[in-house]
Amino acid sequence: DAGNRIAAPACVHFTADWRYTFVTNDCSIDYSVTVAYGDGTDVPCRSANPGDILTFPGYGTRGNEVLGAVLCATDGSA
């Protein structure tokens, strides 16, 4: 699950609100990322090229929390 993955590097930023979580790749290389949620919600990994802004679900209205952006395996095992 996403909670056991490695945190994305500092150049990958996220902002979260109740509806959306935006993940921005300000790094110079591509990363495969997802978002970790406090309740363990699992969302698919997505590829982020340099400069990309990805949209993931927000924390909702039921007390969930976005813990951060995390890296995914690049070999398809994520």
Swiss-Prot record:
> Which keywords does the record carry?
Alpha-amylase inhibitor, Disulfide bond
GO molecular-function terms, A-Z: alpha-amylase inhibitor activity
Q: What Gene3D superfamilies does the entry give?
A: Alpha-amylase inhibitor
> The organism sits in which domain of life?
Bacteria
Entry's SMART domains? A_amylase_inhib
- The intrachain disulfides are C11-C27, C45-C72
Its job: Inhibits mammalian alpha-amylases specifically but has no action on plant and microbial alpha-amylases.
Instruction: Give the protein's recorded name.
Output: Alpha-amylase inhibitor Haim-1
Annotated organism of origin = Streptomyces griseosporeus
Lineage of the native species?
Bacteria, Bacillati, Actinomycetota, Actinomycetes, Kitasatosporales
